[in-house]
C-alpha cells in the first residue's frame, strides 16, 4: 500500500513538473509573439535565448488565447462533479476562542465536519483523511487565543495553501447578526486577476458543493484587496422595496503566504509560490 502511494506520488509530481515546464515555455513564446506584434524589444533573458527564438519559427502551437496553466490538474477529475468532504481541526490544546472559531468555520462550509485534534500526529491525521475519502483538510492555528493562520490541504496529492489570518471577528461579536444558514451558498470572488489568484479561487471554490443554488439566500464573498482576502458571509431577504442583507459572520481577512504542491504532512513537497518579505517590492506588488 505504501509503495503504491509512493509510486503514484512520484508519477504525479513528474507529470506536474512536465506541465509546469511546458507552461513556462508557452509563456515565453507568448511574450515573443506579443513583442513581435507590437514592435517592442524582447526582455534580456529571452533575447539571449537563441534556441527559444530558433524553435519559435517552427512552433505551431501558438494560439490567440493562452492555454490554461495546467496547474489545477488536482481538481480536474472532481471539480463540479464530486461534493467536497471537508474536515476542520485545530492545533493541539486549542483555546476556547480557537475552538469557537473552528465551529464557525465548520458552519461556513457545507458538508464540513469538525474534528477535535486530541493527540493526533499530522501524518496519522492525513492518512485517516485519505482513507475516509476526505477531499480537504482545514487546520487552524492561534497565538495567545487569537487565530493566526488557516491551512487548506487537498487530497490525495495536494496542493496545500497556507494563509495568515487578520482582524478575526467571531459571530457573537457582530451586532445585529443574522441567523446562521446551512444551505449551499452563492459564492462571489472579486478582483482575482493573476494566474496565482485564479489558483487560489480554484482551491477555495472546491471547498463548497457544486451545482446551482437558485433558492439559496446565503452569500459568501471572497474579495481581494491588496492581496488580503476579505471573507464575509451574508443572508438576504427579498422585500417589496428590494433586498435586505444581514451579516452572519465570522468576519476575517486572510493572506496567502505559501503554496505547496504536496499534502500537509509532506515537508519535502515542492514550493509552488512563497511570499518573500525580504524582496524590496514585496509590500508594493500585488500577487493575486
Curated annotation (Swiss-Prot):
Gene3D superfamilies in the cross-refs: Probable brix-domain ribosomal biogenesis protein
Gene Ontology cellular component annotations, sorted alphabetically: Mpp10 complex; small-subunit processome
Organism encoding this protein: Candida glabrata (strain ATCC 2001 / BCRC 20586 / JCM 3761 / NBRC 0622 / NRRL Y-65 / CBS 138) (Yeast)
Keywords: Nucleus, Ribonucleoprotein, Ribosome biogenesis, rRNA processing
Function statement: Component of the U3 small nucleolar ribonucleoprotein. Required for the early cleavages at sites A0, A1 and A2 during 18S ribosomal pre-RNA processing.
Primary location class: nucleus
Pfam family, one: Brix
This protein's name: U3 small nucleolar ribonucleoprotein protein IMP4
SUPFAM superfamilies assigned: Class II aaRS ABD-related
InterPro entries the record matches: Brix, IMP4/RPF1
Cysteines engaged in disulfide bonds, as pairs: none
Domain Brix, chain residue ranges per copy: 84-265
Compartments in which it is found: Nucleus, Nucleolus
Subunit structure: Component of a heterotrimeric complex containing IMP3, IMP4 and MPP10.
